[in-house]
Amino acid sequence: MKSYKLVAWGQEGQYADSPKPIPGPADVLIRVKAVGLCRSDLDMMDSKPGSDPYASAIDANYILGHETSGVVEDLGSSVTDLFKGESVVVHHMRHCGFCNFCEAGVEQHCEYFKRGAIGMTRGCGFDGGLAEYLVVPRTELVSIGHEDPVLYAPLTDAGVTAYASCKDIFRNARPGQYVLVIGIGGLGSYAVQFLRLLTSARIIAADNSNERLTLAKELGADEAILSNASSKAEIDRITLNRGVDSVVDFVGSDATLQLAVSVVRPQGFVSVPGMQGGSVRLGWNLMATSAKFSLSLGSTRQDLREVCQLAKEGKLRIEVDRFSFDEIPRAYQMLRDGKLKGRAVIVMD
């Protein structure tokens, strides 16, 4: 079958002929319909041999693509709750199902599949969806019935990772509180939607692009500010010098992390799914007292079910830029150059 692989670290992906996978008794063979492309794919391609977080933890030579949707092509003998032709999405985080984390329902931290700071996933250490077919255990699938797989592909990482990074805020946000979302890209745009749908907090969006700030307002942000040296002063003005109760930083650079800790209130919460490798000093007089700081990793299958349900109810704005399988290099280049309007999605023939 045709596929697109990361053959070696520090190289662009390559088209390859790969064996068609065969499902075991507890597996499902998926005919891939759509695969979203992610900036982390570029990070893997750009990784130097032995470098963190990818090349130091896993081996190259796997099929890329961790935002995968498709239809059931064939079923293992013990899989009885799906039918051929049913639309499904893949929860890409690998998990054993038996370790303490899996039993606690936080399988993104699975001890068996954790390597350094990352969890091994479809398209990151294991073959992903940029191929005609993909075999996964039944436990890694969420059914979407007869929904369009193309629109659901970006929800399997961009959507659900944003959702998971905001879950503590969903539970704790109260009317009158402020939430700062830094970075209104593929993930941050979903975070604004989830926060608008599931909380009554006032949302401040921060980005260095006026175009993305306009999008944030369309998606439900109450305020939109440019990320620059004046960001803290602008947030102080908006909040009457109270600061914000929660921050979600989808960038993770030195500058954005410093902004986050400088504006969060006592007993506030900073969630950092962004992976730009920034650092920040924490300590007395450097961050508000009793504030919590969390590096957010991945999501759970239940998170994906909840996100898909919101999509089925028509509550999410899902924007995709469609490319054919033959256009994968061009799609990645447009992602690298920042020329996409929506999430790049490879639509299979």
Q: How would you describe each model-predicted region?
A:
Residues 170-175, 198, 214-294:
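Glycine-rich cofactor phosphate-binding loops and adjacent beta1-alpha1 units
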Residues 139-141, 145-229:
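Mid-domain Rossmann-like dinucleotide-binding core that forms the NAD(H)/NADP(H) cofactor-binding site
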Residues 258-262, 304-349:
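C-terminal hydrophobic helical "lid"/dimerization subdomain
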Residues 91-142:
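Cysteine-cluster motifs in flexible loop/terminal segments that predominantly coordinate metals
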Residues 85, 176, 221, 243-244, ...:
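Local beta-strand N-terminus motif with an aromatic residue
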Residues 269-271, 281-320:
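Rossmann-fold dehydrogenase core element
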Residues 209, 276, 299:
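Residues in the short beta-alpha loop(s) of Rossmann-like NAD(P)-binding domains
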Residues 21-35, 50-103, 145-147:
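Glycine-rich beta-strand-centered segment in the early N-terminal region that forms part
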